[in-house]
Amino acid sequence: MTIDRYRRFARLAFIATLPLAGLATAAAAQEGANGKSFKDDFDTLDTRVWFVSDGWNNGGHQNCTWSKKQVKTVDGILELTFEEKKVKERNFACGEIQTRKRFGYGTYEARIKAADGSGLNSAFFTYIGPADKKPHDEIDFEVLGKNTAKVQINQYVSAKGGNEFLADVPGGANQGFNDYAFVWEKNRIRYYVNGELVHEVTDPAKIPVNAQKIFFSLWGTDTLTDWMGTFSYKEPTKLQVDRVAFTAAGDECQFAESVACQLERAQSE
C-alpha cells in the first residue's frame, strides 16, 4: 500500500523464540519473533490467537469502520464481510483480524476466496509498525476488486514500498478458493499462487527484517481510485479464508499440500 494503514493499533511486545533444537536459523535472530509454526482451519475463531479489530478506521482513505460483527466462522471458513451499515462516522462496516504474536522467517500460506467489488481490497499480509515501536515492515498479497484476475504482491521496508508486482490468478480470485504463499528468508522472498512460483525478490533493500503479525482484512475506499478503482457498492460481499498456516524456517511443514512440503521434497530429491 501507499499508506501506513495500521499506525493506530495497540500492540503487545513479545520476546524471540528459538526454532527446533540444533537448527540454527536466521529466524532465531529476529527480535520479537515469538510465534511458532501453526495451522488454523477456522473451525472456530480462537481469540487467544487472533485479535479482532473493532470500532475504528485507519484514516480518511478508508470508507468503512472495522467491526467485530463483520467477522465470523461458518462451517470451517473465516468470513470477513463488507456491507452498508453505519458504524460511528462511516456508512459501511468491514472486518479484519490479526495475530497476537509476531512471526519471523518461514513459509506463510492461506487459502482464500476474495470479495467482489471495485474499490475493495481483500488482503492477506504481514505487518509491524510504529504502534509496536518498530519500523513499518510489511509483506502483502492484495486482491483489488477492480481486477480480480490479478493479485498484487508488495513489500515495505522501513515504510518504503513501491515494489508492486501483479500476478495472475487463473479463473479469478473471487470465483473460488486459491492458495497464496510466500517464503520469507533473510536473503530472499518467494511468492506462490496455487503452488506455482510467481515472483522472487533478492534485493536486500527490498526484504523486511522485523518480525511481523499476520493479518486478514477486507476494506474499501472512496479516494484511492487510481489504485483500487472507483468504489461501487451493490450488496454485501465477503473475503473467505479456508486455512492459514505458518511454518518456521527449519520446522516440518504443517499440511500435505503446503509449499513448505513441496520445497522439502525438492531438497530431498
Swiss-Prot record:
It is found in: Secreted. The active site is at E138 (nucleophile), E142 (proton donor). Residues 40-252 form the GH16 domain. Residues 1-29 form the signal peptide. Its EC number is 3.2.1.-. Pathway: Glycan metabolism; exopolysaccharide biosynthesis. It holds the Pfam family Glyco_hydro_16. PANTHER family: GLYCOSIDE HYDROLASE FAMILY 16 PROTEIN, GLYCOSYL HYDROLASE-RELATED. Belongs to the glycosyl hydrolase 16 family. This is Endo-1,3-1,4-beta-glycanase ExoK. The lineage of its organism: Bacteria, Pseudomonadati, Pseudomonadota, Alphaproteobacteria, Hyphomicrobiales.
